[in-house]
């Protein structure tokens, strides 16, 4: 975990370049991040403080890359920090409500997508753009949730929280990228947000994991930010347990993607793979770096990672190098300072509810304000939309400064049996219809 005093910008001279801005280019097919000069930071950027905007541009967004959205979107390349304290640059896409007047204060939500892949086709800054070729990216569908937040009258920051290399599963640094993306949004003159803006975090599944790292890091890494609440939807609390749970199942592609990414963050893991993976296994991990999430799930359905090793899988998982990785990537190393709402399905086939029970207990024992919705009816995919009305109401209360209720530790009543869920889902259906037809969103708070 990075100590604030170890940041490169803390000892170097501040980068004093003026960030250049690119005006909107309509109907232009976006380049992949690996080929797009916008993503490459200028010389000397490492001396900038985290959250400094290095360049910006206006972009068109489109649902599934095809249906243009009538929203104002600005992308910011900004300086941030990786898990080892080294400077890097990544991008956030900031969307501002159409009716927001210059200088007007509105809440800012950092929405973390379930990128869940190394391929830059899945990065929000690419996948959300008009004419993006991102078939198989989960990110494109999440424009519906982002639009629901915009309809509340909130500005939304959507960071590439896996960083420029798509290192899914790496600890700590997703939180730094989220927090520095918020700083960049507040610092950007182009975006025009007030410094007094209250801030919320929201993400589900892989996005919930990134949101959890941000919630855990913000007290020490970004005490300057007024983060009033964080919603952690089905975060991956224990990657080691999840690997064992999903390996060999229809969703085996997900842990395989994580291993493909983590070998780039942990030299010890890379060494174990080099020594024990067969040629087919090494070739597969290389191919996974270019696959979208859906591609990987289809290709790896039912595959057992042990089939690509020269020793039993459990022996490999028990090595000091792999044990260190799984221990390091487990949530709960710090206690969130803002109030958190944790949402988890009891019958989740992807994330074991016991992992999230343990995480909630750890946060509560550490003194965090935890509201835990432990849903008895839903499963992994359905709980995200079904819990969205509850999430939006909870965030609205945090932005309004309302006190938390006394009964905030754990609820089990299924969202599907709550009448307010249906009113909220009806509202979300109207928003989804407007997104799918490319119509302008009007403010429709719950």
Curated annotation (Swiss-Prot):
GO terms for biological process: lipid catabolic process. GO terms for molecular function: triacylglycerol lipase activity. Gene3D superfamilies: 1.10.260.130, alpha/beta hydrolase. It holds the Pfam family LIP. It comes from the Bacteria. InterPro entries: AB_hydrolase_fold, Lipase_secreted. SUPFAM superfamilies: alpha/beta-Hydrolases (SSF53474). PANTHER family: LIPASE 5, PTHR34853. Belongs to the AB hydrolase superfamily. Lipase family. This is Probable inactive lipase MT1628. It comes from Mycobacterium tuberculosis (strain CDC 1551 / Oshkosh). The lineage of its organism: Bacteria, Bacillati, Actinomycetota, Actinomycetes, Mycobacteriales.
């Amino acid at each position: 975990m990075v100590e604030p005093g170890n940041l490169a910008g803390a000892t170097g001279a501040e980068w004093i370049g003026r960030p250049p801005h690119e005006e909107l280019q309509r109907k232009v097919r976006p380049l992949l991040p690996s080929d797009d000069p916008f993503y490459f930071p200028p010389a000397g950027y490492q001396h900038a403080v985290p959250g400094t905007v290095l360049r910006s541009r206006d972009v068109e967004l489109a649902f599934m890359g095809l249906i243009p959205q009538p929203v104002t979107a600005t992308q910011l390349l900004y300086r941030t920090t990786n898990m080892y304290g080294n400077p890097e640059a990544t991008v956030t896409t900031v969307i501002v409500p159409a009716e927001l007047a210059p200088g007007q204060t509105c809440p800012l939500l950092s929405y973390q997508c379930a990128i869940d892949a190394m391929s830059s086709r899945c990065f929000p800054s690419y996948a959300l753009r008009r004419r993006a070729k991102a078939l198989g990216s989960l990110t494109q569908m999440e424009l519906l949730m982002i639009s629901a937040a915009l309809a509340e009258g909130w500005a939304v920051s959507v960071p590439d929280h896996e960083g420029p290399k798509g290192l899914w599963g790496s600890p700590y640094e997703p939180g730094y990228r989220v927090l520095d993306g918020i700083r960049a949004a507040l610092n950007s003159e182009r975006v025009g947000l007030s410094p007094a803006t209250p801030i919320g975090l929201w993400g589900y599944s892989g996005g919930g994991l990134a949101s959890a790292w941000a919630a855990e890091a913000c007290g020490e890494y970004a005490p300057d930010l007024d983060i009033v609440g964080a919603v952690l939807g089905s975060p991956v609390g224990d990657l080691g347990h999840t690997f064992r749970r999903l390996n060999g199942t229809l969703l085996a592609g997900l842990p395989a993607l994580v291993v493909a990414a983590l070998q780039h963050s942990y030299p010890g893991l890379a060494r174990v793979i080099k020594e024990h993976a067969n040629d087919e296994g090494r070739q597969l991990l290389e191919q996974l770096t270019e696959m979208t999430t859906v591609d990987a799930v289809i290709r790896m359905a039912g595959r057992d990672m042990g089939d690509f090793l020269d020793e039993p899988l459990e022996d490999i998982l028990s090595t000091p190098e792999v044990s260190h990785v799984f221990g390091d990537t487990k949530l709960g190393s710090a206690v969130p300072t803002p109030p958190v709402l944790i949402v988890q399905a009891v019958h989740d086939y992807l994330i074991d509810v016991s992992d999230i029970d343990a995480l909630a207990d750890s946060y509560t024992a550490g003194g965090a304000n935890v509201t835990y919705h432990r849903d008895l009816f839903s499963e992994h995919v359905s709980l995200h939309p079904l819990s969205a009305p509850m999430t939006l109401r909870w965030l609205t209360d945090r932005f309004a400064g309302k006190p938390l209720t006394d009964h905030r530790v754990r609820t089990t009543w299924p969202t599907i049996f709550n009448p307010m869920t249906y009113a909220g889902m009806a509202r979300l259906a109207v928003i989804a219809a407007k997104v799918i037809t490319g119509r302008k969103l009007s403010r429709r708070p719950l």
